Design a protein with these regions (language model features):
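Generic protein-terminus/edge-of-domain signal
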Residues: 1-71, 75-77
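A hydrophobic/aromatic-rich effector-binding and dimerization subdomain
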Residues: 2-11, 16-27, 97-163, 190
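Short, charged/polar surface micro-motifs in flexible loops or helix N-caps
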Residues: 41, 65-67, 90-92, 110-114
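Amphipathic, well-ordered alpha-helical segments in soluble domains
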Residues: 59, 147-154, 176, 180-183
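Short beta-strand His + acidic residue motifs that chelate non-heme Fe in jelly-roll/DSBH
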Residues: 69-71, 87, 93-98, 104
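Short acidic-glycine-tyrosine-enriched beta hairpin
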Residues: 74-88
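Short, Lys/Arg-enriched, Trp-marked, Pro/Gly-tolerant hinge/linker segments that flank
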Residues: 142, 162-172, 184-224
Length: 225
């Protein structure tokens, strides 16, 4: 797959400066999908990763190993083995103190998601990109990672190839992404992990309230056939 170059623009808002990454206007947004090694991104955009920035794209960062801090909308999250972050477009983020990291990163536009089945697309958006608590991340165990590695390998192999039919290639990537995200939903350690390590006190109060409502609903509403 031909590697696409993201355009970079410096934005200043309320005396805060950050970088904006977006697809070039002449790039086909329905067929764009990129999967890259995290270390490759780190080497190419070392300074950009440390500065506050956002993508006008959906992105997934899966850290196989390493440590550091991921800042999302000014809240800090710990990076550890198996951590996966799911970011919707325009989430402001930065990385600090990345050490011995290894993993993959994927990004794709809104139009690419339209290639995924409507029902599954809704589940993916609600669970991963627009959850009630505002930001989602999970842990993938080594055993679960081994089960997902064949899908990731197929994505990486397809990314290295040139396809004349870009639409067919995009559909193939959408199918593989669907399988990968389904496995992450099934095998990932979610729990209330999306609520932890957020530095904002008000956010923690909100998170506990959401958890109490969900627990109370489950306790008082039996599932009926």
């Amino acid at each position: 797959m031909e590697k696409q170059t993201l355009e970079t623009k410096k934005i200043v808002h309320n005396n805060i400066s950050y970088l904006q990454y977006d697809l070039a206007k002449d790039q086909a947004k329905t067929s764009f999908f990129d999967i890259s090694d995290i270390n490759t991104i780190k080497d190419l955009r070392q300074e950009g990763l440390q500065k506050m920035h956002f993508l006008n794209l959906y992105s997934i960062f899966w850290f196989y190993s390493g440590e550091g801090t991921h800042i999302v909308d000014f809240d800090e999250y710990e990076i550890g083995q198996g951590t996966v972050f799911f970011l919707s477009p325009k989430r402001i983020r930065a990385y600090r103190n990345l050490n011995n990291v290894d993993g993959i990163a994927m990004c794709f536009p809104e139009d690419f998601l339209l290639k995924i089945d409507n029902e599954l697309q809704g589940r993916i958006k609600t669970k991963m990109f627009y959850p009630a608590n505002g930001f989602a991340h999970c842990k993938i165990s080594e055993a679960a990672k081994e089960k997902m590695k064949p899908i990731v390998k197929l994505m990486q192999e397809a990314s290295a190839l040139q396809y004349e039919d870009k639409s067919l290639q995009a559909s193939y990537f959408a199918s593989l992404l669907s399988l990968l995200l389904i496995d992450m939903i099934r095998l990932g350690e979610w729990g209330d992990s999306s609520f932890s390590n957020v530095s904002s006190d008000s956010f923690q109060v909100y998170a506990k309230f959401v958890q109490m409502v969900e627990d109370n609903y489950i306790e008082h509403h039996a599932v009926k056939d």
